[in-house]
A protein has these predicted regions:
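Peripheral terminal and inter-domain segments
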Residues: 323-482
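Active-site helix/loop module of the DD-peptidase/beta-lactamase fold
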Residues: 64, 83-121, 143, 172-210
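A short, well-structured edge-of-sheet supersecondary motif
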Residues: 22-58, 282, 289-293
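Active-site Gly/Thr loop motif
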Residues: 192, 236-292
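Active-site SXXK
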Residues: 46, 63-89, 116, 164-168, ...
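Active-site-proximal alpha-helical segments within enzyme catalytic domains
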Residues: 160-167, 206-227, 280-297
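Structured C-terminal helix/loop/strand segments within mature extracytoplasmic catalytic/sensor domains
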Residues: 276-338
Length: 482
């Protein structure tokens, strides 16, 4: 098999007891519930047995993994602890020392490495919003007093993970991405990790771009207690501690997030998972010697996890003690993300004027920022079709696929060129345009009618990212808010 992105050996799905009917039931359940999957990798007993992508996403193109990045950061912390550079009981302000340049709010001086890892800093709101766009994020974190006793309460806290990355940078003298690659990613075959930065420092809490196979490999490393093909990469005992419940998350609204939290890992009765926004998962099932990794674009993301546990997990038959024979994995092909039916190509120009209305669930509009789009139009251009619109006050255009997805580029803010896959379809008087930002989970659908244009996202870009930020090549994400 070609186009691989890890050093995982391969075997046939049948040889390792992964039933084809389980995969078919999984895909059917997603389609029936309107769930958008982008990639799937299944690993059993250390062998890649299923791999594929849903067009226009590509199985060997890294995509933004969001909070799967947290597990990469935590792994670096575990290695630093194993090297004697940190300990779980270290107080963060003492490790940072002179890096703390401002006042330390009451309670912050008590916060330990363990509490950062388990998101139990005592804060009841995320500390990140006050940190992310500051030139001194450490000062911003230390200025936020915990609302409760450190160690007493769980709060999903991206700022805590950013600080873990800063601790690693400080005690190792290396960039986070370099330390991670040198110590544990390169043996997995991950040698060119891209990690988004702000003010010259990797996010830590997010920003890793990984293929679905690479997410599966990291999860498999954890399933194997930090040992990869006979070589110990993570310290002995680290995985056991990181993957068990460190603090209760019983108050979480999402049922799959209410079962407990470890060290930047979510716990559940059958195992644990690496978990990124909008269903980027590396699900570890220790008893079945299996890993199921998915990339996706869903808000909310509950449906993907439920389908994995309901359909894929039961399709893992008991293993025998027979040696595993090398073979080709089951290649998932011929699938594509949901696309509306229609009459065919546009038959003439369609123009709208004024702002593109935002049609999102109320909870999304309340929580997230969306790009300002206006004056959307679709017209003929050099034998094909083109979308024209105004983005953040500037005109831009992108060519459109019709009968199939077209991979091209959108010129976004500050002239940054963003990879997209596009498609356009007509249904009566309605023209639908889809822009898949294929370096990320995000897809924008524009609906144009005589009443104007409406935008809807499969899942909203996080952290105020401009459209220019939806690209692996965008080095420094900066806010783009009115």
């Amino acid at each position: 098999m070609t186009d691989r992105s890890t050093t995982l050996p391969t075997a046939s799905a049948a040889a390792l007891g992964v039933r084809q009917d389980a995969l078919e039931a999984f895909v059917t359940a997603l389609e029936q519930n309107g769930v958008e999957l982008h990639g799937l990798a299944v690993v059993r007993r250390g062998h890649l047995v299923q791999l594929g992508a849903w067009t226009p996403w590509q199985q060997q193109r890294p995509t933004l993994a969001y909070s799967v990045s947290k597990t990469v950061t935590a792994s670096c912390v575990g290695i630093a602890i194993g090297d004697g550079l940190l300990s779980l009981d270290d107080r963060v302000v003492e490790v940072l020392g002179p890096e703390v340049t401002g006042p330390v709010a009451p309670g912050v001086e008590q916060i330990t490495v363990h509490q950062l890892l388990s998101m139990a800093t005592g804060h009841t709101v995320d500390t990140l919003p006050a940190m992310l766009w500051k030139s001194d994020p450490i000062r911003a974190f230390c200025g936020q007093a915990p609302q409760a006793e450190p160690g007493s309460v769980f709060c999903y806290n991206n700022g805590a993970t950013w600080l873990l990355g800063e601790l690693v940078r400080r005690v190792t003298g290396e960039r986070l991405v370099d330390f991670a690659t040198r110590r544990f990613l390169a043996p997995l075959g991950i040698t060119d990790l891209h990690w988004q930065e702000s003010f010259g420092a990797e996010f830590g809490f997010s920003g890793c771009f990984l293929t679905v196979e690479q997410s599966a490999a990291i999860a498999e490393l954890y399933r194997c207690d930090g040992v990869w093909q006979g070589e110990r990469l993570l310290p002995e005992g680290w995985v056991e501690r990181a993957s068990r419940e460190q603090i209760s998350t019983a108050g979480e609204e999402n049922a799959h997030s209410a079962m407990g939290y470890g060290y930047q890992l979510w716990w559940h009765p059958d195992g644990f998972r690496l978990d990124g926004a909008f269903a980027q998962y590396g699900i570890v099932l220790p008893e079945q010697e299996a890993v199921i990794a998915v990339t996706s674009g869903n808000f909310p993301s509950l449906g993907v996890m439920s389908a994995v546990l309901e359909h894929l997990q039961p399709g893992l038959a008991p293993l025998t003690d027979n040696p595993v024979q090398a073979g080709d994995p089951e290649q998932i092909s011929g699938l594509e993300v949901p696309w509306p039916a229609g009459d065919g190509d546009p038959v003439g120009p369609v123009r709208t004027a004024g702002p593109v209305r935002n049609e999102q669930p109320a909870e999304a509009l309340d929580q997230w920022w969306f790009p300002a789009l206006a004056d959307a139009a679709v017209g003929a251009q050099q034998g094909g079709w083109q979308l024209q619109l105004t983005l953040a006050g500037q005109p831009t255009a992108v060519d459109l696929g019709t009968s199939a997805w077209l991979t091209t580029e959108l010129v976004a803010e500050q002239g940054h060129r963003v990879p997209v896959a596009t498609r356009c379809r007509r249904d009566g008087a309605t023209t639908t345009v889809s822009l898949a930002f294929i370096d990320t989970p995000h897809r924008l659908t524009l609906t144009l009618t005589e009443d104007g244009a409406v935008q809807r996202w499969n899942c909203p870009p996080l952290n105020g990212a401009p459209l220019a930020g939806l690209s692996v090549d965008y080095e420094t994400v900066t806010p783009n808010r009115a």
